[in-house]
Amino acid sequence: MPISSTLNQRVRARLEDDDFGHVSDESVSNEALDEGESNEDTEQDNSDQRETDDDDTEDDGHTEISDINPSLNTISFGALAKAQAALGKRKRRTTSTTDITPKRTKVLSRQSPTPSTSSNKEHDQGQGLSEFQKHLASNAKKPPQKLTHRTSKHAPTIQSSRHAVSRKRTILEPLAVPKPRDPRFDSVVLSHSTNGDPSTAANADIHARNNYAFLNHYRTDEIAELRKQVSALQTKKKKTERDDHEIVRLKREITSMSDRQRAFERKEMEREVLVQHRRREKELIREGKKSQPYFLKKGEVKREVIAKRFTEMSGKEKQRALERRRKKVAGKERKEMPWGRRGVE
C-alpha cells in the first residue's frame, strides 16, 4: 500500500535539527511525486480498484497493522503532521472532483440531456451549466404586466395581444330595425322635389327651412296658449289635485317647447354668422387682399353668436343673462372646492 511504503521510507533513526530539514524536503518531494502519479492513474485504475478493494480489504488490514505498529514508536510528530496535511489535501481534491461532478451530470441529464464524449468532458459540463442557467432564467415566472389606463375617455383602449378571439361567427346578419323618418325633411325627397335643378338640390336643407318656416310661428303661438292655460289654473279659486298635476304638466311642456325654440334660434344665428363671414372672405379674395379664405372654428362661431345676442338684448335681459352666467360660474367653482368650504361664502 502507498501509505505503508511512505511511512517505512521515512522511518529512520532520530535525526538532528540540521538533517531534519533535508529529510523533510525529500519527503515532500516524494509526496508530490506520489500525488502526481496517483492523479494520473486515478482515471485508468478506478474500475480496477473498485473491484479489487472489496476482495483485499481483509488481507490488507492485517498487513497494514503489522507494518505500522512497530514503526509508530519511532516516528516524530512533525512527520505525522506533514503526512496528515498531505492526506487531507488529497482527500479534498478527490472529493471535489469525484463527488460533485456526478451530481452535476445527473441534474443536467434531467433538465437538458446532451451527448458528451470523454475528450470534451469538462467543456460539455461548462456548456451544460450555462444551458441549465438559461433554462432556469427562461422558466422563471415573469410578473404580470398591468395594463395602463387610458389618458382620457377619447383615447383608444389598451388590450393585450394574447386576448382570445371569439370563436362565434355571425352566419346570418340580424335584420335592420326600421327607423321612422319624416319625408318632409329628408334630403332624398327634397332633392327630387326641386325639379332637377342642381343649385336648389344642393341647398335642399335651406329650401326645406324656408318652406316650413311657419312651424316656428305655430310653436310661439302654442307657447302663448299654454301660458294662458297655466295662468287660468293658478287663478282658480278651488283647485283640486288634478289641477295641480295639470299645472306641472303644462309647465314642463312650456319649458320643452321654449328650449326647442331657443335651439332653433341659436342655429339660425350660427348660420347667419357663417353666411356673413363667407361673404366677407369672398369680397376680400375678389379684391385681392387675400389668397386663401379663412374658415371659422366652432368655438369662434359660438363666441360671435353670443356677442351678437348680447348686443341685441335690452337692459333687463342683459342683467338677467349676466346673473345666470355668474351663478353658473359660481356653481362650478363651488364644486371644485373642498366639502368643508362649500357652505362658507
Swiss-Prot record:
Disulfide bonds: none annotated. Residues 32-59 have a biased composition (Acidic residues). This is rRNA biogenesis protein RRP36. Residues 78-87 have a biased composition (Low complexity). Residues 312-322, 330-345 have a biased composition (Basic and acidic residues). GO terms for biological process: maturation of SSU-rRNA from tricistronic rRNA transcript (SSU-rRNA, 5.8S rRNA, LSU-rRNA). Keywords: Coiled coil, Nucleus, Ribonucleoprotein, Ribosome biogenesis, rRNA processing. It comes from Ajellomyces capsulatus (strain H143). GO terms for cellular component: 90S preribosome; nucleolus. Residues 219-267 form a coiled coil. Signal peptide: none annotated. Transmembrane segments: none annotated. InterPro entries: RRP36. Residues 143-153 have a biased composition (Basic residues). Component of the 90S pre-ribosome involved in the maturation of rRNAs. Required for early cleavages of the pre-RNAs in the 40S ribosomal subunit maturation pathway. Residues 66-76, 108-119 have a biased composition (Polar residues).
